[in-house]
Amino acid sequence: FMVLICLAAPLFMASLPAWLLQPILTYKYVQPIMRVLTRPLIAFVIYNLTFTLWHIPPIFRVFLYSELWHGALYISVFATTCLALFPVMSPLPEVFPKLAVGKRLGYLLAMLIAHFPLAGVVAFYPRPLYPFYQPQVFGLTRLLDQYSGSAIMAVSLLLTVLTGIAITFVQWLANTEDASHQPDTKHPDPTPEPVVDDPVPT
């Protein structure tokens, strides 16, 4: 999960060329749907709801014992992560605009905070939530493996969000510096009119 969310999806979104996506996402039947799905609140809810539902033990157990559903599980996590990244990494900003810098930072922080309840439950639940812990790698008990998974989830998400915040801040700083070096065309400096001497009478 965390490789898909923290590494694969961001790299995939960053590498998508606009020329490839434009004819697909601007198709008359696709664009209205994508405009709705990529709205920050809707994308945020879809991603977090999907991620949380798949961690409910009975649902997770069903997906583990079926190769077809197991594949659907990972595809859905990857797809909804890409959807959630549109407000901050839109490959077509002229069609699906990115959030302003301040809102982008708030969105990234909200994405991080939204994972805390699930990570907390997995970290502090006194019994193993999932029965599927075979083989036991490095001799870890089921409960210790669960706690380790929660720690990996929290740390990887924290590092990913901090990286996103740092990149956003650097881009904003560069844009601000470029704007400060551009001439102000709206309020040009007043140019003094040339002084013309009165004609000398002849």
State where each predicted segment sits:
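Alpha-helical membrane segments of multi-pass proteins
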Residues: 2-202
